Protein backbone atom coordinates (compact mmCIF):
# COMPACT_ATOMS: atom_id res chain seq x y z
CA UNK A 1 0.00 0.00 0.00
CA UNK A 2 2.99 2.26 0.34
CA UNK A 3 3.43 2.36 -3.46
CA UNK A 4 -0.12 3.59 -4.02
CA UNK A 5 0.50 6.84 -2.19
CA UNK A 6 1.30 9.95 -4.28
CA UNK A 7 4.94 10.30 -5.21
CA UNK A 8 5.11 14.08 -4.95
CA UNK A 9 5.26 15.34 -1.34
CA UNK A 10 2.78 17.83 0.02
CA UNK A 11 3.49 21.55 0.05
CA UNK A 12 3.78 21.53 3.86
CA UNK A 13 6.98 19.53 3.75
CA UNK A 14 8.82 22.36 1.93
CA UNK A 15 8.68 24.52 5.05
CA UNK A 16 11.44 22.53 6.76
CA UNK A 17 14.83 22.79 5.05
CA UNK A 18 16.03 19.58 6.70
CA UNK A 19 13.15 17.63 5.31
CA UNK A 20 13.68 19.14 1.90
CA UNK A 21 17.31 18.07 1.88
CA UNK A 22 16.25 14.55 2.88
CA UNK A 23 13.76 14.36 0.09
CA UNK A 24 16.38 15.46 -2.40
CA UNK A 25 18.68 12.72 -1.22
CA UNK A 26 15.82 10.21 -1.42
CA UNK A 27 14.91 11.10 -5.03
CA UNK A 28 18.15 12.34 -6.53
CA UNK A 29 17.12 11.67 -10.21
CA UNK A 30 13.38 12.28 -10.20
CA UNK A 31 13.50 16.06 -9.87
CA UNK A 32 15.71 17.03 -12.85
CA UNK A 33 13.90 14.59 -15.17
CA UNK A 34 10.45 15.78 -14.11
CA UNK A 35 11.44 19.45 -14.53
CA UNK A 36 12.79 19.00 -18.10
CA UNK A 37 9.81 16.91 -19.16
CA UNK A 38 7.33 19.47 -17.86
CA UNK A 39 8.97 22.28 -19.88
CA UNK A 40 8.88 20.23 -23.07
CA UNK A 41 5.29 19.21 -22.50
CA UNK A 42 4.25 22.78 -21.80
CA UNK A 43 5.85 24.05 -25.03
CA UNK A 44 4.24 21.26 -27.08
CA UNK A 45 0.85 21.87 -25.47
CA UNK A 46 1.08 25.60 -26.16
CA UNK A 47 1.91 24.96 -29.84
CA UNK A 48 -0.92 22.42 -30.19
CA UNK A 49 -3.39 24.74 -28.48
CA UNK A 50 -2.37 27.64 -30.73
CA UNK A 51 -2.81 25.49 -33.83
CA UNK A 52 -6.10 24.14 -32.54
CA UNK A 53 -7.43 27.61 -31.86
CA UNK A 54 -6.39 28.71 -35.35
CA UNK A 55 -8.10 25.71 -36.90
CA UNK A 56 -11.22 26.24 -34.82
CA UNK A 57 -11.30 29.91 -35.83
CA UNK A 58 -10.88 29.01 -39.47
CA UNK A 59 -13.65 26.40 -39.26
CA UNK A 60 -15.96 28.68 -37.32
CA UNK A 61 -15.65 31.51 -39.87
CA UNK A 62 -18.49 31.24 -42.40
CA UNK A 63 -17.38 30.58 -45.96
CA UNK A 64 -18.35 33.35 -48.35
CA UNK A 65 -20.50 32.35 -51.31
CA UNK A 66 -18.50 31.53 -54.44
CA UNK A 67 -18.38 34.34 -56.99
CA UNK A 68 -20.49 33.81 -60.10
CA UNK A 69 -18.52 32.65 -63.12
CA UNK A 70 -17.65 35.60 -65.37
CA UNK A 71 -19.24 35.73 -68.83
CA UNK A 72 -17.22 35.02 -71.94
CA UNK A 73 -17.14 38.68 -72.96
CA UNK A 74 -16.82 40.24 -69.48
CA UNK A 75 -14.14 42.87 -69.07
CA UNK A 76 -13.02 43.99 -65.60
CA UNK A 77 -13.65 47.59 -64.70
CA UNK A 78 -10.43 49.64 -64.93
CA UNK A 79 -11.37 52.23 -62.32
CA UNK A 80 -12.86 50.09 -59.53
CA UNK A 81 -11.06 46.76 -58.95
CA UNK A 82 -12.76 44.38 -56.53
CA UNK A 83 -11.59 44.81 -52.92
CA UNK A 84 -9.09 42.33 -51.63
CA UNK A 85 -10.07 40.49 -48.50
CA UNK A 86 -7.57 38.46 -46.55
CA UNK A 87 -8.40 34.77 -46.30
CA UNK A 88 -9.82 33.51 -43.08
CA UNK A 89 -7.44 31.63 -40.81
CA UNK A 90 -4.25 32.16 -38.93
CA UNK A 91 -0.58 32.18 -39.76
CA UNK A 92 -0.50 28.49 -40.68
CA UNK A 93 -3.37 28.82 -43.17
CA UNK A 94 -1.68 31.80 -44.78
CA UNK A 95 1.61 29.92 -45.13
CA UNK A 96 -0.11 26.88 -46.66
CA UNK A 97 -1.48 29.01 -49.55
CA UNK A 98 1.42 31.00 -50.96
CA UNK A 99 -0.06 31.02 -54.44
CA UNK A 100 -2.49 33.79 -53.49
CA UNK A 101 0.35 36.28 -53.12
CA UNK A 102 2.13 35.20 -56.32
CA UNK A 103 2.08 37.95 -58.94
CA UNK A 104 0.03 37.30 -62.04
CA UNK A 105 1.72 37.21 -65.43
CA UNK A 106 1.05 39.80 -68.14
CA UNK A 107 -1.08 37.29 -70.09
CA UNK A 108 -3.42 36.88 -67.07
CA UNK A 109 -4.01 40.57 -66.42
CA UNK A 110 -7.65 41.47 -66.72
CA UNK A 111 -8.90 37.87 -66.25
CA UNK A 112 -10.84 36.24 -63.45
CA UNK A 113 -9.41 32.85 -62.54
CA UNK A 114 -11.86 30.14 -61.58
CA UNK A 115 -10.99 28.97 -58.05
CA UNK A 116 -12.57 26.38 -55.69
CA UNK A 117 -15.54 27.59 -53.65
CA UNK A 118 -13.50 28.06 -50.50
CA UNK A 119 -10.98 30.48 -52.02
CA UNK A 120 -11.09 34.14 -52.84
CA UNK A 121 -9.13 35.31 -55.87
CA UNK A 122 -7.45 38.67 -56.10
CA UNK A 123 -8.02 40.37 -59.48
CA UNK A 124 -5.24 42.64 -60.68
CA UNK A 125 -6.25 45.90 -62.40
CA UNK A 126 -6.06 45.67 -66.21
CA UNK A 127 -3.38 47.31 -68.31
CA UNK A 128 -3.85 50.72 -69.86
CA UNK A 129 -4.01 49.50 -73.46
CA UNK A 130 -7.03 47.31 -72.77
CA UNK A 131 -5.56 44.25 -74.54
CA UNK A 132 -5.26 40.68 -73.28
CA UNK A 133 -8.24 38.98 -71.70
CA UNK A 134 -11.63 37.81 -72.68
CA UNK A 135 -13.86 40.79 -72.46
CA UNK A 136 -15.42 43.51 -74.48
CA UNK A 137 -13.66 46.82 -74.77
CA UNK A 138 -15.39 49.93 -73.36
CA UNK A 139 -18.00 51.13 -75.78
CA UNK A 140 -18.39 47.78 -77.56
CA UNK A 141 -21.30 45.48 -76.91
CA UNK A 142 -22.48 42.21 -78.30
CA UNK A 143 -26.16 42.38 -79.10
CA UNK A 144 -28.67 42.76 -81.90
CA UNK A 145 -27.98 44.83 -85.01
CA UNK A 146 -27.88 48.55 -84.43
CA UNK A 147 -27.01 48.25 -80.73
CA UNK A 148 -24.46 50.90 -79.92
CA UNK A 149 -23.04 52.40 -76.77
CA UNK A 150 -22.11 56.02 -76.47
CA UNK A 151 -19.83 57.48 -73.82
CA UNK A 152 -19.65 55.47 -70.60
CA UNK A 153 -21.31 57.17 -67.58
CA UNK A 154 -18.35 56.52 -65.30
CA UNK A 155 -15.29 54.36 -64.72
CA UNK A 156 -17.26 51.97 -62.54
CA UNK A 157 -19.84 51.21 -65.25
CA UNK A 158 -19.51 47.79 -66.81
CA UNK A 159 -20.07 47.04 -70.48
CA UNK A 160 -22.17 43.97 -69.75
CA UNK A 161 -24.49 45.24 -67.01
CA UNK A 162 -28.20 44.57 -67.19
CA UNK A 163 -31.02 46.88 -66.14
CA UNK A 164 -30.70 45.80 -62.51
CA UNK A 165 -26.98 46.41 -62.29
CA UNK A 166 -26.16 42.68 -62.36
CA UNK A 167 -24.20 41.03 -65.15
CA UNK A 168 -26.31 38.87 -67.48
CA UNK A 169 -25.86 35.10 -67.48
CA UNK A 170 -22.92 33.87 -69.57
CA UNK A 171 -23.80 33.11 -73.23
CA UNK A 172 -23.48 29.70 -74.77
CA UNK A 173 -20.68 30.77 -77.08
CA UNK A 174 -17.12 29.86 -75.94
CA UNK A 175 -14.36 32.48 -75.66
CA UNK A 176 -12.53 33.53 -78.78
CA UNK A 177 -9.23 31.78 -78.00
CA UNK A 178 -8.70 29.74 -74.81
CA UNK A 179 -4.94 29.49 -75.18
CA UNK A 180 -3.89 33.08 -75.65
CA UNK A 181 -4.93 36.67 -75.08
CA UNK A 182 -7.49 38.01 -77.50
CA UNK A 183 -6.82 41.20 -79.38
CA UNK A 184 -9.90 43.35 -79.79
CA UNK A 185 -10.17 46.43 -82.03
CA UNK A 186 -9.54 49.80 -80.47
CA UNK A 187 -12.68 51.25 -78.87
CA UNK A 188 -14.31 54.02 -80.84
CA UNK A 189 -17.14 56.46 -80.20
CA UNK A 190 -19.66 54.34 -82.09
CA UNK A 191 -19.12 50.69 -82.88
CA UNK A 192 -21.45 47.74 -83.17
CA UNK A 193 -21.17 44.05 -83.81
CA UNK A 194 -23.18 42.12 -86.43
CA UNK A 195 -26.40 40.60 -85.13
CA UNK A 196 -25.97 37.19 -83.48
CA UNK A 197 -28.20 34.24 -84.14
CA UNK A 198 -29.92 34.71 -80.84
CA UNK A 199 -29.65 32.79 -77.64
CA UNK A 200 -30.41 32.88 -73.94
CA UNK A 201 -27.32 34.99 -73.23
CA UNK A 202 -28.53 38.04 -75.12
CA UNK A 203 -31.16 39.99 -73.27
CA UNK A 204 -32.64 43.47 -73.42
CA UNK A 205 -30.24 46.39 -73.94
CA UNK A 206 -28.94 48.25 -70.93
CA UNK A 207 -29.58 51.88 -69.99
CA UNK A 208 -26.59 53.11 -72.06
CA UNK A 209 -27.71 51.31 -75.23
CA UNK A 210 -30.12 52.39 -77.93
CA UNK A 211 -31.21 51.19 -81.32
CA UNK A 212 -29.75 53.03 -84.29
CA UNK A 213 -31.58 53.12 -87.64
CA UNK A 214 -30.08 50.75 -90.21
CA UNK A 215 -27.74 52.36 -92.72
CA UNK A 216 -29.12 52.78 -96.25
CA UNK A 217 -27.74 50.34 -98.80
CA UNK A 218 -24.79 51.49 -100.84
CA UNK A 219 -26.44 50.44 -104.11
CA UNK A 220 -30.10 50.09 -104.90
CA UNK A 221 -32.93 51.23 -107.13
CA UNK A 222 -33.09 54.93 -107.91
CA UNK A 223 -36.74 55.12 -108.95
CA UNK A 224 -37.87 56.25 -105.49
CA UNK A 225 -35.14 58.91 -105.34
CA UNK A 226 -36.08 60.26 -108.77
CA UNK A 227 -39.79 60.35 -107.85
CA UNK A 228 -39.07 62.17 -104.58
CA UNK A 229 -36.87 64.70 -106.37
CA UNK A 230 -39.55 65.29 -109.01
CA UNK A 231 -42.19 65.83 -106.28
CA UNK A 232 -40.01 68.44 -104.56
CA UNK A 233 -39.25 70.21 -107.82
CA UNK A 234 -35.58 69.31 -107.76
CA UNK A 235 -33.48 67.98 -110.58
CA UNK A 236 -33.29 64.19 -110.70
CA UNK A 237 -30.00 62.69 -109.53
CA UNK A 238 -27.45 61.74 -112.13
CA UNK A 239 -27.54 58.19 -113.38
CA UNK A 240 -25.11 55.92 -111.65
CA UNK A 241 -23.13 53.04 -113.07
CA UNK A 242 -24.75 49.69 -113.59
CA UNK A 243 -24.29 46.99 -111.00
CA UNK A 244 -23.52 44.36 -113.60
CA UNK A 245 -19.88 43.24 -113.83
CA UNK A 246 -17.83 44.71 -116.65
CA UNK A 247 -17.75 42.88 -119.92
CA UNK A 248 -14.73 41.01 -121.11
CA UNK A 249 -12.07 42.94 -123.08
CA UNK A 250 -12.90 40.99 -126.23
CA UNK A 251 -16.54 42.06 -126.07
CA UNK A 252 -15.54 45.68 -125.55
CA UNK A 253 -13.25 45.55 -128.56
CA UNK A 254 -15.90 43.97 -130.72
CA UNK A 255 -18.52 46.50 -129.66
CA UNK A 256 -16.44 49.45 -130.86
CA UNK A 257 -17.14 50.45 -134.47
CA UNK A 258 -14.24 49.76 -136.78
CA UNK A 259 -13.09 52.71 -138.80
CA UNK A 260 -12.26 52.31 -142.48
CA UNK A 261 -14.37 49.16 -142.85
CA UNK A 262 -18.02 48.91 -143.71
CA UNK A 263 -20.14 46.48 -141.77
CA UNK A 264 -22.27 45.71 -144.89
CA UNK A 265 -21.40 45.83 -148.61
CA UNK A 266 -22.46 49.04 -150.23
CA UNK A 267 -24.55 48.51 -153.31
CA UNK A 268 -22.86 50.16 -156.24
CA UNK A 269 -25.03 51.97 -158.74
CA UNK A 270 -24.94 50.88 -162.37
CA UNK A 271 -23.57 53.88 -164.18
CA UNK A 272 -22.43 52.23 -167.42
CA UNK A 273 -25.33 51.89 -169.90
CA UNK A 274 -25.30 50.23 -173.30
CA UNK A 275 -25.81 52.83 -176.04
CA UNK A 276 -26.86 50.38 -178.71
CA UNK A 277 -30.31 50.99 -180.18
CA UNK A 278 -32.96 48.86 -178.52
CA UNK A 279 -30.64 47.67 -175.58
CA UNK A 280 -30.89 49.34 -172.20
CA UNK A 281 -28.53 47.15 -170.14
CA UNK A 282 -26.38 48.85 -167.50
CA UNK A 283 -23.16 47.70 -165.81
CA UNK A 284 -21.15 48.79 -162.81
CA UNK A 285 -17.79 48.28 -164.55
CA UNK A 286 -16.64 49.59 -167.87
CA UNK A 287 -14.95 46.30 -168.77
CA UNK A 288 -18.26 44.54 -168.49
CA UNK A 289 -19.85 47.09 -170.77
CA UNK A 290 -17.09 46.59 -173.38
CA UNK A 291 -17.61 42.86 -173.36
CA UNK A 292 -21.32 43.43 -173.84
CA UNK A 293 -20.79 45.74 -176.81
CA UNK A 294 -18.79 42.99 -178.53
CA UNK A 295 -21.93 40.93 -178.67
CA UNK A 296 -23.54 43.65 -180.73
CA UNK A 297 -20.55 44.26 -183.00
CA UNK A 298 -19.43 40.60 -183.32
CA UNK A 299 -15.83 41.35 -182.41
CA UNK A 300 -13.86 38.36 -180.93
CA UNK A 301 -10.34 39.44 -180.03
CA UNK A 302 -9.40 36.31 -177.94
CA UNK A 303 -8.11 33.39 -180.14
CA UNK A 304 -7.20 29.86 -179.05
CA UNK A 305 -3.54 29.08 -179.95
CA UNK A 306 -3.87 25.33 -179.55
CA UNK A 307 -2.64 23.38 -182.59
CA UNK A 308 -5.49 22.71 -184.98
CA UNK A 309 -8.00 24.85 -182.99
CA UNK A 310 -9.22 28.15 -184.43
CA UNK A 311 -11.82 29.13 -181.86
CA UNK A 312 -12.31 32.82 -181.05
CA UNK A 313 -13.98 34.46 -178.06
CA UNK A 314 -15.18 37.94 -177.12
CA UNK A 315 -14.21 37.50 -173.42
CA UNK A 316 -11.02 36.30 -171.81
CA UNK A 317 -12.76 34.06 -169.27
CA UNK A 318 -14.43 32.20 -172.11
CA UNK A 319 -11.02 31.53 -173.68
CA UNK A 320 -9.64 30.27 -170.36
CA UNK A 321 -12.58 27.92 -169.91
CA UNK A 322 -12.09 26.61 -173.48
CA UNK A 323 -8.40 26.06 -173.01
CA UNK A 324 -9.10 23.61 -170.12
CA UNK A 325 -10.67 21.26 -172.60
CA UNK A 326 -7.33 20.82 -174.31
CA UNK A 327 -5.30 20.44 -171.13
CA UNK A 328 -7.81 18.39 -169.12
CA UNK A 329 -7.37 20.58 -166.06
CA UNK A 330 -10.32 20.35 -163.67
CA UNK A 331 -9.80 22.68 -160.71
CA UNK A 332 -13.35 22.36 -159.28
CA UNK A 333 -13.61 19.13 -157.28
CA UNK A 334 -16.55 17.80 -155.26
CA UNK A 335 -15.73 17.26 -151.56
CA UNK A 336 -18.40 14.55 -151.25
CA UNK A 337 -17.18 12.39 -154.09
CA UNK A 338 -14.18 12.03 -156.38
CA UNK A 339 -15.57 13.89 -159.36
CA UNK A 340 -13.96 17.12 -160.63
CA UNK A 341 -15.08 19.73 -163.13
CA UNK A 342 -13.45 22.35 -165.31
CA UNK A 343 -16.26 24.87 -164.77
CA UNK A 344 -17.69 26.18 -161.55
CA UNK A 345 -21.27 26.13 -162.80
CA UNK A 346 -20.95 22.45 -163.58
CA UNK A 347 -19.82 21.81 -159.99
CA UNK A 348 -22.82 23.76 -158.68
CA UNK A 349 -25.18 21.58 -160.70
CA UNK A 350 -23.44 18.47 -159.41
CA UNK A 351 -23.76 19.54 -155.77
CA UNK A 352 -27.52 19.76 -156.14
CA UNK A 353 -27.60 16.02 -156.78
CA UNK A 354 -26.12 15.32 -153.33
CA UNK A 355 -28.85 17.32 -151.63
From Swiss-Prot:
Claim: Signal is one of the keywords in the record: no
Residues recorded with modification Phosphothreonine = 173, 244
Q: How is it modified after translation?
A: Ubiquitinated. Polyubiquitination involves WWP1 and leads to proteasomal degradation of this protein.
Where in the cell does this protein reside? Nucleus
Zinc finger (C2H2-type) residue numbers: 272-296, 302-326, 332-354
User: In which residue ranges is the amino acid composition biased (Pro residues)?
Assistant: 62-85, 165-198
Q: Which InterPro entries match?
A: Znf_C2H2_sf, Znf_C2H2_type
The record's GO molecular-function terms, alphabetically, read: DNA binding; DNA-binding transcription factor activity; DNA-binding transcription factor activity, RNA polymerase II-specific; RNA polymerase II cis-regulatory region sequence-specific DNA binding; sequence-specific double-stranded DNA binding; zinc ion binding
Question: Motif (9aaTAD) spans which residues?
Answer: 43-51
Example GO CC term: the record gives: nucleus
Q: Where is the composition biased (Basic and acidic residues)?
A: 18-32
Write the record's keywords in alphabetical order, separated by commas: Activator, DNA-binding, Metal-binding, Nucleus, Phosphoprotein, Repeat, Transcription, Transcription regulation, Ubl conjugation, Zinc, Zinc-finger
One Pfam annotation, family name? zf-C2H2
Q: What does this protein do?
A: Transcription factor that binds to the CACCC box in the promoter of target genes such as HBB/beta globin or NOV and activates their transcription. Might be involved in transcriptional regulation by modulating the binding of the RARA nuclear receptor to RARE DNA elements.
> What does the record note on quaternary structure?
Interacts with WWP1.
The UniProt family comment states:
Belongs to the krueppel C2H2-type zinc-finger protein family.
Q: What's noted about domains in the record?
A: The 9aaTAD motif is a transactivation domain present in a large number of yeast and animal transcription factors.
Q: What is this protein called?
A: Krueppel-like factor 2
- Source species of the chain: Homo sapiens (Human)
Amino acid sequence: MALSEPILPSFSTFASPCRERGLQERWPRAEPESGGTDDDLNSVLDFILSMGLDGLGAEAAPEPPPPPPPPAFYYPEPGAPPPYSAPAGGLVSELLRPELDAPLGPALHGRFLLAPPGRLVKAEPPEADGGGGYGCAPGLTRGPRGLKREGAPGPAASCMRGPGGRPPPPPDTPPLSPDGPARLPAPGPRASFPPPFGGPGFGAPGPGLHYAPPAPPAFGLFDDAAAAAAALGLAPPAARGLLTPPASPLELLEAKPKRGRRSWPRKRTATHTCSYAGCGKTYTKSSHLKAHLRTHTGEKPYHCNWDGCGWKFARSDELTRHYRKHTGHRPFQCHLCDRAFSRSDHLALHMKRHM
